[in-house]
Regions:
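Short, polar/acidic, helix-capping and beta-turn segments at strand->helix junctions
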Residues: 1-174
């Protein structure tokens, strides 16, 4: 059985204090889930300010020792409860039957480029990650999510790049 849970810190201290509380809450929750035979399969991390919080988050024990060992995506979407960080976690007693990848470009990879070039770079990174795994984009890709900063400015470049890549690999652009 699959189980989904949203975990958020209750305190309103600093981001670091909230991370410490979230670590304890998450570990407690995952321990209880393990008692029922369910293991972590996926998490989505919601940050209110990814530009300033991402590096701090990925350096935590919570991310390094737990979340990064499973399918995890990190998005900039402020939690509605004002907590600055929330987790959506999926636990299950079933075997995972899919491959999940979450990729982002480094600051260096985005410097002095536009949204078209960045989107092409992201897809090329994805395509390289499939090499030697017996999978290809046309046969095995089910869904893409691309989170775009300043969508009003960057939308056109992202869509053109995605369409160009999809056309190159024989996928439909609809």
């Amino acid at each position: 059985m699959n189980n989904y849970q949203i975990l958020s810190p209750k305190s309103r201290g600093s981001f670091t204090e909230r991370l410490e509380e979230l670590q304890a809450t998450t570990q407690s929750y995952l321990s209880k889930e393990a008692e029922t035979g369910r293991q972590l399969q996926y998490s989505k991390v919601f940050l209110s300010d990814a530009q300033n919080q991402y590096q701090t988050f990925v350096e935590t024990e919570l991310y390094q020792d737990t979340l990064s060992q499973h399918a995890t995506s990190i998005v900039e979407q402020a939690p509605l409860d004002g907590s600055k960080i929330s987790l959506l976690v999926k636990t299950s007693d079933e075997q995972q039957d899919f491959i999940f990848q979450s990729m982002r470009l480094t600051e260096k990879e985005t410097r002095a480029t536009n949204s078209y070039v960045q989107t092409i770079a992201l897809f090329e990174k994805y395509i390289r990650s499939m090499e030697g795994k017996g999978v290809d984009m046309k046969t095995h890709l089910v869904r893409t999510w691309i989170y775009v900063a300043d969508i009003d400015v960057n939308y056109e470049g992202v869509v053109k790049a995605r369409n160009d890549i999809f056309k190159r690999y024989g996928l439909t652009i609809d």
